[in-house]
A protein has these predicted regions:
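Conserved RNA-binding domains used in RNP assembly and mRNA/RNA metabolism
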Residues: 15-110
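Short, Lys/Arg-enriched N-terminal segments with co-localized hydrophobic residues
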Residues: 1-15
């Protein structure tokens, strides 16, 4: 009798198992999950002043870091947002990055 109860209890526990939680930070909006990323990207740097050849050769793009939720990604662009309205599909603090500018993308873990 004891083995039967133990077996049944284990069977119920396996049946009632919760879905595996993601180890990545995300938000669900209108049944769609958006993951949080740290995006490192190269930004254009400009200067309208006079410079020597030595100064000009040391002139490099700025390496920027953005923390945001990824809205979409395709062959040309990555679209992100940082703010949203709960319970509705409204996004703000939006950016569109050309794929060529992105140096690195990392999913943020919990």
């Amino acid at each position: 009798l004891y083995l039967f109860i133990t077996y049944t209890k284990r069977g119920i526990q396996e049946f009632m198992r919760r879905p595996k939680k993601s180890k990545y930070k995300s938000v669900v909006i209108k049944k769609k999950r958006y993951y949080f990323y740290k995006i490192t990207w190269a930004d254009i740097t400009g200067d309208a002043g006079h410079a020597t050849a030595h100064d000009f050769s040391g002139f490099l793009p700025s390496i920027m870091v953005t923390h945001a939720y990824m809205f979409s990604k395709d062959r040309k662009y990555v679209r992100t947002f940082a703010s949203y309205e709960e319970g509705d599909e409204l996004f703000s603090d939006r950016n569109v990055f050309p794929i060529g500018c992105i140096v690195k993308m990392e999913k943020v873990t919990l």
